[in-house]
Amino acid sequence: MDQPLQPQQGELNWRLSAHPITLLCFLGFRSSALLMYLFGVLFIKNFVLVFILTLLLLSADFYYLKNIAGRRLVGLRWWNEVNTSTGDSHWVFESSDPTTRTITATDKRFFWLGLYITPALWIGLAVLAIVTLSKIIWLSLVAIALILTITNTVAFSRCDRFGQASTFANRAFGGSIVSNITGGLLGRLFK
């Protein structure tokens, strides 16, 4: 008899997640705004009610992804800081130390798929709202959804690149060869 295959790390199986509740909430928030919008457009027909409920779900998704799911599932976090004296705004990125925290392949795969698929679905809904001119008023809600989901997507993509670059720099400059060379040079200079 053949034994059933055991699920492997990296498969799209939420049971393999290191943080299954965080993952399920992440997926729930990501899909609930889309489902509310679709259900509202097709069945409810009350624009104000659907707009408010979808906006609340989008806001909860934005907050949860930015502050909880990103940190727990892939060890990334971002925020925006404003210099009060100059008024300049810049994004700050934070990533967990790869030596102290392991990110499971399943969590990583779910996170990045959910992050990139959601804006693509909202873009499809925007095209649909434009094509069916009777639903053009719904485009305002889709535009807000696109702004929120694309902001998180861009920020986490930059945060991931920043985290990979700093990890590479730490490995390059933290190695024993580099420390021996710099230690030898500094030792000669200050004898």
UniProtKB/Swiss-Prot annotation:
Regions that span the bilayer: 16-36, 38-58, 110-130, 136-156
Keyword Electron transport applies: no
GO biological process: protein secretion; vesicle-mediated transport
Domain of life assignment: Eukaryota
Protein's membrane topology: Multi-pass membrane protein
One GO cellular component term: Golgi membrane
Main location: Golgi
Residues carrying sugar: 83, 180
UniProt key word Glycoprotein: yes
Keywords, ordered alphabetically: Glycoprotein, Golgi apparatus, Membrane, Transmembrane, Transmembrane helix
Subcellular location: Golgi apparatus membrane
Family, per entry: Belongs to the TVP23 family.
Function according to Swiss-Prot or TrEMBL: Golgi membrane protein involved in vesicular trafficking.
Protein name listed in UniProt: Golgi apparatus membrane protein tvp23
Organism: Aspergillus clavatus (strain ATCC 1007 / CBS 513.65 / DSM 816 / NCTC 3887 / NRRL 1 / QM 1276 / 107)
The organism's taxonomic lineage, starting at the top: Eukaryota, Fungi, Dikarya, Ascomycota, Pezizomycotina
Gene name, Swiss-Prot/TrEMBL: tvp23
